[in-house]
């Protein structure tokens, strides 16, 4: 059964909700808009009439209807607006321009040092430069970071890998670029993108698990991202997995024995070096190439990591009870080597009633992190729960403005 992005109960959400729906689902008849968003046909007729007059949407071809006269489809006009998405890492910022239908129009990367004294002003200048270069109407900017965020609307960030503690990312960027800015954990941004354009259109409760430099998890329950009391839900990379003193590998969070310390990119390389599979300067691509050429020792490194990930993820399944799990991230390029350890470990660790939970592995491109960040903006029309606060409201104002 397909799920809509959600009912639109408040009047200020209706115009932008309709525009957003046409962006995520493409040309749609008025009756389908009413049904999907939980609106009356009269409301849809009146609001779409106004949106057509403003030049935001247009009538397209007619399609057959059930027993009545043909229904006219509605679609977006070309310049309805775009969102900017930025993914912040330890050495660069990836930025994309994304249309309402999720299409990435352009992408660029800037070198970046988050530990520098002027890190936030520098990030503001980078984004202001990209905003100034846009020819399209900007709806807002979404920012994804590898850490905890107090709320999308505020954007105060704790990210040890960026050397940020209570960093006022949201306020600083809003002052620098003069546009709505929403900030969230980078894996949560991928979950937001899945809600709009991917598996979330067919499922209302799911996990988005990322493997790569780190291990993360975006949790979606009843169509909404679960953030926890302080914005730190889903940090499964910091589940303790050690059994004895030798297992307590140091983690970037400052603790030891975390899942990420063992199966993140650095942990895989450490294990491979200790076993002599790769040299002292060997990297994850080196290990992956060895596995691809048939090196059984290299494949065993991935399989052991997969088994550890499977056991940890089974515990998350028992806690959240999702309909489906989506695996993505840089690490999925070598998933066939992870899977030999993951699948038996994962299934064996699940309760009988949960053993059939599907695990979907999605192909990965580098643009997906930043596209996910842009999805924070593009999800604003459906933000009936108020997750994005005033920033989402400002996006809706821009989306519904003539």
Swiss-Prot record:
InterPro entries named in the record = ATPase_NBD, ROK, ROK_cs, WH-like_DNA-bd_sf, WH_DNA-bd_sf
Query: Per the database entry, where does the chain bind DNA?
Result: 30-49
* Molecular function as annotated in GO: DNA binding
Task: Tell me the superkingdom of the source.
Answer: Bacteria
Q: Does the keyword Manganese apply?
A: no
Q: Which CDD domains does the record associate with it?
A: ASKHA_ATPase_ROK_CYANR (cd24073)
Cross-referenced Pfam families, in alphabetical order?
Answer: ROK
State the UniProt keywords alphabetically. Answer: Carbohydrate metabolism, DNA-binding, Repressor, Transcription, Transcription regulation
- Relate the protein's function as given in its record: Transcriptional repressor of cyclobis-(1-6)-alpha-nigerosyl (CNN) degrading enzymes.
Read off the PANTHER family from this record. Answer: BIFUNCTIONAL UDP-N-ACETYLGLUCOSAMINE 2-EPIMERASE_N-ACETYLMANNOSAMINE KINASE, ROK (REPRESSOR, ORF, KINASE) FAMILY
Q: Family membership, please give it.
A: Belongs to the ROK (NagC/XylR) family.
Q: Give the protein's recorded name.
A: Cyclobis-(1-6)-alpha-nigerosyl repressor
Q: Which organism is it from?
A: Kribbella flavida (strain DSM 17836 / JCM 10339 / NBRC 14399)
